[in-house]
Amino acid sequence: MCNTNMSVSTDGAVSTSQIPASEQETLVRPKPLLLKLLKSVGAQKDTYTMKEVIFYLGQYIMTKRLYDEKQQHIVYCSNDLLGDLFGVPSFSVKEHRKIYTMIYRNLVVVSQQEPSDSGTSVSENRCHLEGGSNQKDLVQELQEEKPSSSDMVSRPSTSSRRRAVSETEENSDELPGERQRKRHKSDNISLSFDESLALCVIREICCERSSSSESTGTPSNPDLDAGVSEHSGDWLDQDSVSDQFSVEFEVESLDSEDYSLSEEGQELSDEDDEVYRVTVYQAGESDTDSFEEDPEISLADYWKCTSCNEMNPPLPPHCNRCWALRENWLPEDKGKDKGNMSEKAKLGDSMQEDEGFDVPDCKKSTVSDSRESCVEENDDKITQASLSQESEDYSQPSTSNSIIYSSQEDVKEFEREETQDKEESMESSFPLNAIEPCVICQGRPKNGCIVHGKTGHLMACFTCAKKLKKRNKPCPVCRQPIQMIVLTYFP
C-alpha cells in the first residue's frame, strides 16, 4: 500500500491536495496537549494513525457534548481543552482545511529512525481496532508495514514522488489474498467506529478527499469511504437534510393571462375616452351612522327611551333596543306644515292626473291650453265691454281703461298663484337625493336607478349607470351585481 508524504508548511496551512487518503495509515505522535486529550477518552498509546486521531477527537466531542444540538456540525470549544489545543472558540466539521491545519499543528510524524516503535504501534493499533485477529496475521502485517514505514519522512523532491508511484505499482501486484485481508482489516476499523460525531468528522473529511482526488488525480481510499457510508445511518442524513431547503414559487410575468397592463385599457377603450371624477363612499356595517366617535356629540345630547330606559344617540328617531319612536321627535308646527304640504301635494297630483303629462318630455300641454282659454275669455269680455262703452257713450274713457287694467292684473295674480302651488307640490314630491348631481360625473342629475333584486340605488345618471352595467361592475353603494338600469323621471 502506498504511503505518500505529508508536507507541512511553515504557517501550518495544509491544502487538501497535499493530504491524500492513504496518509490516514501514516503513524504520527501527538504533542503532549493533544495526547492528554486523546487519553481522556480511552487512548493508551503514544503513536496513532490519522484515523485513530480523528476517531478519538470525535469521541471527545461526543463525550463532552461540545456540538450544537440543532446544527451538529458546529463544535463549541471556547472553555474546553480542545479550544486551548486548536486556538479557536468554535469550528465546523465541514471546514476540512481548517481541521487539517489545527490537527497537524499538534502532530509529529514518526521518523525513519524509529521502525521498531512504529512497528509496535501498528501492532497495538491493529489489536485495539480488530480485537479478534490472531497472532499470525499480526506477524505478517508487521512484515508488510515495516518497509513502508521507512517512507514516512517528508520528501518534497520529485524523485521521492516517483518512488511513491513505483511503490504503488509494486503494491498493485500483490496477491488477492493479502489484498482481501487488508480490506478486511480496514472494514474492521470502520466497524469499530461508533455512530457518533466521529463518523460525521470522518465522513466530511472523506468527501473532501474524494473531491480533491478526482480533480488532481490523487489516489483515494475507497475502503474507508465504503465503511463510513455503510454505517453512517439516518443520523447523518438528517443533519445534512436540515441544512438544505428549497422554496418553490411562481413569478408573475407580464405575458400571463391573469395579469395584463392593457386589460383595463381595452375595457375603457370600448367607447370614447372620457375623464371621470368619482366620489367613493365607504358603506358601513349597518344603515345607521355611528356617533360614538363624533367629538361634537356629548352624553348630554343622548336621549333616554321611555320603554326600556336605553340611552340613544340624538339623531335616530327610534330606540336602538326596542325600536320605540322617540317622544316629541318633531315639533307640532312642522307637523302641521307637513300635513298642509301633503294636502297640497295630493291636490297637485289630482290636478295633474286630470290634466295629464306628455311623456317623456313631461310638458304640460293642457295647462297652456287652459291658460290660453282663460286669456281668450278675458279678451272677449274686455272687447265686449269696450264695444258697449263705445256704443253707449264716448265720454267715459277712464272707466273702460280701469276695467281693462283690473282684468289684466287678475290674470297675472292667478298665474303667479298657480305657479307657486305647482312648485310647492313638485318640491314635496321630489326625493332629496334627486336634487343632487350624479356621484360619478358630478354634472348630470341622478336619473339612472341601479336595480339589483327587489331594491335599487339612485346615485348616478342614466349614462354613467349604463356604463357600469356594460362593464359588469357592481353597484357602487352595496357591491351587489347590477341587473338592470331604469331611467327615472321626476314630475
Curated annotation (Swiss-Prot):
Keyword Ribonucleoprotein tagged: no
Comp. bias intervals (Basic and acidic residues): 333-347, 360-374, 409-425
Chain intervals for the UniProt region annotation (ARF-binding): 210-304
Zn finger intervals (RanBP2-type): 299-328
Region (Region II): 242-331
Region (Interaction with MTBP): 170-306
Region ranges (Interaction with PYHIN1 and necessary for interaction with RFFL and RNF34): 150-230
Post-translational modification, as annotated: Phosphorylation on Ser-166 by SGK1 activates ubiquitination of p53/TP53. Phosphorylated at multiple sites near the RING domain by ATM upon DNA damage; this promotes its ubiquitination and degradation, preventing p53/TP53 degradation. Autoubiquitination leads to proteasomal degradation; resulting in p53/TP53 activation it may be regulated by SFN. Also ubiquitinated by TRIM13. ATM-phosphorylated MDM2 is ubiquitinated by the SCF(FBXO31) complex in response to genotoxic stress, promoting its degradation and p53/TP53-mediated DNA damage response. Deubiquitinated by USP2 leads to its accumulation and increases deubiquitination and degradation of p53/TP53. Deubiquitinated by USP7 leading to its stabilization.
Chain residue ranges for the region called Interaction with USP7: 223-232
Biased composition regions of type Acidic residues, renumbered to the chain: 253-274
Gene Ontology MF term list: 5S rRNA binding; identical protein binding; ribonucleoprotein complex binding; ubiquitin binding; ubiquitin protein ligase activity; zinc ion binding
Entry keyword set: Apoptosis, Cytoplasm, Metal-binding, Nucleus, Phosphoprotein, Transferase, Ubl conjugation, Ubl conjugation pathway, Zinc, Zinc-finger
Location(s), subcellular: Nucleus, Nucleoplasm; Cytoplasm; Nucleus, Nucleolus; Nucleus
Residues covered by region (Disordered): 1-21, 142-187, 211-237, 253-275, 333-402, 409-428
UniProt cross-references to Gene3D superfamilies, sorted A to Z: SWIB/MDM2 domain, Zinc/RING finger domain, C3HC4 (zinc finger), Zn-finger domain of Sec23/24
SWIB/MDM2 domain: residues covered: 26-109
This protein's domain notes: Region I is sufficient for binding p53 and inhibiting its G1 arrest and apoptosis functions. It also binds p73 and E2F1. Region II contains most of a central acidic region required for interaction with ribosomal protein L5 and a putative C4-type zinc finger. The RING finger domain which coordinates two molecules of zinc interacts specifically with RNA whether or not zinc is present and mediates the heterooligomerization with MDM4. It is also essential for its ubiquitin ligase E3 activity toward p53 and itself.
Protein task: E3 ubiquitin-protein ligase that mediates ubiquitination of p53/TP53, leading to its degradation by the proteasome. Inhibits p53/TP53- and p73/TP73-mediated cell cycle arrest and apoptosis by binding its transcriptional activation domain. Also acts as a ubiquitin ligase E3 toward itself and ARRB1. Permits the nuclear export of p53/TP53. Promotes proteasome-dependent ubiquitin-independent degradation of retinoblastoma RB1 protein. Inhibits DAXX-mediated apoptosis by inducing its ubiquitination and degradation. Component of the TRIM28/KAP1-MDM2-p53/TP53 complex involved in stabilizing p53/TP53.
Complex formation: Interacts with p53/TP53, TP73/p73, RBL5 and RP11. Binds specifically to RNA. Can interact with RB1, E1A-associated protein EP300 and the E2F1 transcription factor. Forms a ternary complex with p53/TP53 and WWOX. Interacts with CDKN2AIP, RFWD3, USP7, PYHIN1 and RBBP6. Interacts with ARRB1 and ARRB2. Interacts with PSMA3. Found in a trimeric complex with MDM2, MDM4 and USP2. Interacts with USP2 (via N-terminus and C-terminus). Interacts with MDM4. Part of a complex with MDM2, DAXX, RASSF1 and USP7. Part of a complex with DAXX, MDM2 and USP7. Interacts directly with DAXX and USP7.
Name recorded for this polypeptide: E3 ubiquitin-protein ligase Mdm2
Species in which this protein is naturally found: Equus caballus
UniProt lineage: Eukaryota, Metazoa, Chordata, Craniata, Vertebrata
Gene transcribed to yield this protein: MDM2
